[in-house]
Amino acid sequence: MTSLVPGAGLLPIPTSSPLTAVSSLGVSLSSLGAIPAAALDPNITALGEIPQPPLMGNVDPSKIDEIRRTVYVGNLNSQTTTADQLLEFFKQVGEVKFVRMAGDETQPTRFAFVEFADQNSVPRALAFNGVMFGDRPLKINHSNNAIVKPPEMTPQAAAKELEEVMKRVREAQSFISAAIEPESGKSNERKGGRSRSHTRSKSRSSSKSHSRRKRSQSKHRSRSHNRSRSRQKDRARSKSPHKKRSKSRERRKSRSRSRSRDKRKDTREKVKERVKEREREKEKEREKEREKDKERGKNKDKDREKEKDHEKERDKEKEKEQDKDKEREKDRSKEADEKRKKEKKSRTPPRSYNSSRRSRSASRERRRRRSRSSSRSPRTSKTIKRKSSRSPSPRGRNKKEKKREKERDHISDRRERERSTSTKKSSSDRDGKEKVEKTNTPVKEKEHSKEADSTVSTDADEKDTARTEEESKAQHNGNCQPHEERLCSTADAV
């Protein structure tokens, strides 16, 4: 597969010498490769003996000469080698007519076809086989195909192309003039259009008159007509090369203009593509920034939710601590109430115990009095002692026991009332506690009085112990007086 590449297609032969062309391209011969001396020798005999490959049967006989004059050049670096370099390189061998690059540009290696003007330069080119061209050795061989050239244009097609090119040139000129001077440009276009139409009409009228004259002359003078025809043919022959030259020049100009326009279009398209790519990149960056902003907002919401959860947990912990503090206060208040109750109990001994103490102290006092009376009175008859030693009547004893039981009942009722009031006061608030303490002050005074009584009773007990020892001594003697018994009974009643 052969394909034309922009800037590397069919190249015409420049008129300058090969060495000056190489220097103008900036390609040094030393970098391209060493040229063998046999290739530069014009009198080559051995190279002409290289056999040419047989041609295919279906080859066009008109292209056989072109095939014999073309050479296949392979193992070219697709990134560095160009058709201009090959043209300048093979000009050293002979006159080069066409150079065509072939192969895929994306592949690392490519190949080319070089057509020489003379068949004698082909064996010289074959001598370059293996020569280093750049960084690779060349592979040169006879070609089996001719270079495909564009078809030659007919005069009608060339005229159409010229008209199209002229139209484009006129449009460009009008556009430029309108851009620079819109008003003056419009007036000039009008004048130019009138002058052109005037000249066209003149040319048409002159041609018509000339043809009429020729017809009249042909009728009368055939010889002069033949002479004029021959003259016209000569003029046409003389004018034809000028026309051809002008057409070729116009073609070249049109091609150069079309190329420049194509280049401008390509540059404009490239600029537009770059702008579009930049806009796309900007849009992508904006989308990325938006996504980042969304992620940041989500993270902020999550952080807020976490903070709310932490605050809720802290509130719960505070509530728990407050509940614990309340429970601790309640426990402390209960413990304080229990301690107070215990202190009260320890301070207030049971009245039964006090009454028993009093009864004991009264009995002791009786015994002491008896012992004293026995010691004072003289020892009389035994009959009197027996009468005094007799116990009192059972009726008196029953009355005393009933009084003692009533007093015990009253004391127990009072204690129960005090306990109930203390429990109610402990359940009330601190304000109630202060009131309870105020109410308990008289009770404490009573307890202090009871403690004083208990201290008095202890002193009396100590005295009773001393008296009991004396009474025990007196009982051995068996002395007692009735007057002392009466005093004892009155003390018990009290």
Swiss-Prot record:
Cited CDD domains:
RRM2_SREK1 (cd12260)
Keywords (A to Z) from UniProt: mRNA processing, mRNA splicing, Nucleus, Phosphoprotein, Spliceosome
User: Which compartment or compartments is the protein found in?
Assistant: Nucleus
The primary gene name is Srek1
Q: Which residues form the RRM domain?
A: 69-145
Which residue intervals make up region (Disordered)?
A: 176-494
For this chain, the family text in UniProt reads:
Belongs to the splicing factor SR family.
State where composition is biased (Basic and acidic residues): 183-192, 263-340, 404-453, 463-474
Cite the source lineage: Eukaryota, Metazoa, Chordata, Craniata, Vertebrata
Under PANTHER family, the record lists: SERINE/ARGININE-RICH SPLICING FACTOR (PTHR32343), SPLICING REGULATORY GLUTAMIC ACID AND LYSINE RICH PROTEIN 1 (PTHR32343:SF71)
GO biological process terms on file: mRNA processing; RNA splicing
Kindly state the tissue distribution recorded for this protein.
Answer: Ubiquitous. Detected in liver, brain, lung, spleen, testis and pancreas.
> Where does the record place the modification Phosphoserine?
174, 187
Q: How does it assemble?
A: Interacts with SREK1IP1. Homodimer. Binds SFRS1, SFRS2, SFRS3 and SFRS6. Interacts with the spliceosome.
The GO cellular component terms are:
spliceosomal complex
Provide ranges: composition bias, Basic residues.
Answer: 193-230, 238-262, 357-373
What's the protein here called? Answer: Splicing regulatory glutamine/lysine-rich protein 1
Report the source organism: Rattus norvegicus (Rat)
Q: Which Gene3D superfamilies match?
A: 3.30.70.330
Q: Name one GO molecular function term.
A: RNA binding
Name the job this protein performs. Answer: Participates in the regulation of alternative splicing by modulating the activity of other splice facors. Inhibits the splicing activity of SFRS1, SFRS2 and SFRS6. Augments the splicing activity of SFRS3.
Residues annotated as carrying Phosphothreonine in the record are 348
**What's the domain of life for this entry?**
Eukaryota
